[in-house]
Amino acid sequence: MTRVLMIDENRTLTESVGMRCFEQGIAVRMADTFCEGVRHLLETPVSLILLSSAAVHLPGAELARLFDTVAPGVPVVVRVEAGQGMDEQVRFELHGFLAVREPFDVLDLVAKAERPARVVAPRPAAAAAAVEAACR
C-alpha cells in the first residue's frame, strides 16, 4: 500500500491533499510539527514524505542525513510556499529533495507517491538518536 506522510502546519491544505490522496487509494498520515512527523516515521513505513518548508528548522545537509537515517530511500518532497523565493526551492533541491511550489497539482504528488517500488521500513535503532538530536 502506498502511504504519504504530510508534515505541515497548514491543516486546511493537509486535509485537502489528504482527501485527494484518499480518493486515489493512497493512505495518508498527518503531522502538525516536524518532530511529530519524524516520530511517525519510526512507527509507520511510508512511500513518500511531503514536508512544508516552513516546518523545517534544520540546515539542508542535516535534514538530508536525518531522513536518510530515519527513512532511507523514501523520497522527500518539500512544499515551498508561493511567496518564498526561488532560492528556497533550489536550496532543498541541492540537498536531494524534490520541491513543489504552491499551488501544486495533487495528482503530481500522487504520481510521485506511486513511483517507489516498495515501502521502506524505518531503522529504529539508528533513528532514535537522530530523532532525539533533531527534536531538542
What are the residue ranges of the model-derived segments?
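Alpha4 helix (beta4-alpha4-beta5 surface) of REC/receiver domains from two-component response regulators
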Residues: 62, 78-100, 107
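Two-component/phosphorelay signaling modules centered on CheY-like receiver
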Residues: 11-29
